[in-house]
Amino acid sequence: MTVKKIAIFGATGRTGLTTLAQAVQAGYEVTVLVRDSSRLPSEGPQPAHVVVGDVRQAADVDKTVAGQEAVIVLLGTGNDLSPTTVMSEGTRNIVTAMKAHGVDKVVACTSAFLLWDPTKVPPRLQDVTDDHIRMHKILQESGLKYVAVMPPHIGDQPLTGAYTVTLDGRGPSRVISKHDLGHFMLRCLTTNEYDGHTTYPSHQYD
């Protein structure tokens, strides 16, 4: 089945905005759940449907997932590094809604810290990483066709489409641009190659 209708959670974040733009340009009919619709771009590619709400509210998530064929999860906490359950709570609601609506494909972004030595996580990032771990466990136990995307440092370099994807956290570099990361999230919708895997996209930028 060719996926055409997708929901993006976290569409107003750094990677979310470029993923949203690339998805619309690629012809997807995109629904987004946002807390504040003013954070969506005022010009350029627009989502087909906007649900204003909170990923921690099951009813808001259910409304967003209804009628979709796949889901992209780019939840984050921005620059807030305090203890959080937003990403895991949101993911639990997304999984529940997907099962309720018969949607079985989800591509979700966490972090390469889940692939690397846990003792090497910088202390200031430990709380966010702990929630990424909870989020990943929910995906693993979901029974859905999930792709766990675990990027290294996310940069602002231009789109190349020439990144390397490995399954073990080792690659040509410890950076991926937000544009290439978005490109990879969308690529995962067109293949089953990475279903059930942890993936590490990276690229040696000039």
UniProtKB/Swiss-Prot annotation:
Any Pfam family the entry gives: NAD_binding_10
A Gene Ontology BP annotation from the UniProt entry: negative regulation of insulin receptor signaling pathway
Residues annotated with Phosphoserine modification: 42, 82
Reactions catalysed: reduced riboflavin + NADP(+) = riboflavin + NADPH + 2 H(+); bilirubin IXbeta + NADP(+) = biliverdin IXbeta + NADPH + H(+); FMNH2 + NAD(+) = FMN + NADH + 2 H(+); FMNH2 + NADP(+) = FMN + NADPH + 2 H(+)
Disruption phenotype: Adult mice do not show defects in biliverdin degradation or hematopoiesis. Impaired cytoprotective function in stress hematopoiesis, characterized by divergent erythroid megakaryocyte fates. Defective stress erythropoiesis is observed in spleens and in bone marrow erythroid development, in conjunction with defective lipid peroxidation. Mice on high-fat diet gain weight more slowly than wild-type mice and are protected from diabetes due to improved insulin sensitivity.
One example GO MF annotation: peptidyl-cysteine S-nitrosylase activity
Alphabetical list of InterPro entries matching this protein: NAD(P)-bd_dom, NAD(P)-bd_dom_sf, Polyketide_Oxido-like
Protein keywords: Cytoplasm, NADP, Oxidoreductase, Phosphoprotein, Transferase
Residues that hold NADP(+) according to the record: 10, 12-13, 15, 35, 38-39, 54-55, 75-76, 87, 109, 132, 153-154
Source taxon at top rank: Eukaryota
Active site (UniProt): 109, 188
Location within or outside the cell: Cytoplasm
A cellular component term, taken from the record's GO annotations: cytosol
Main location: cytoplasm
Similarity field: Belongs to the BLVRB family.
Role noted for this protein: Enzyme that can both act as a NAD(P)H-dependent reductase and a S-nitroso-CoA-dependent nitrosyltransferase. Promotes fetal heme degradation during development. Also expressed in adult tissues, where it acts as a regulator of hematopoiesis, intermediary metabolism (glutaminolysis, glycolysis, TCA cycle and pentose phosphate pathway) and insulin signaling. Has a broad specificity oxidoreductase activity by catalyzing the NAD(P)H-dependent reduction of a variety of flavins, such as riboflavin, FAD or FMN, biliverdins, methemoglobin and PQQ (pyrroloquinoline quinone).
Assembly information from the UniProt record: Monomer.
Protein name: Flavin reductase (NADPH)
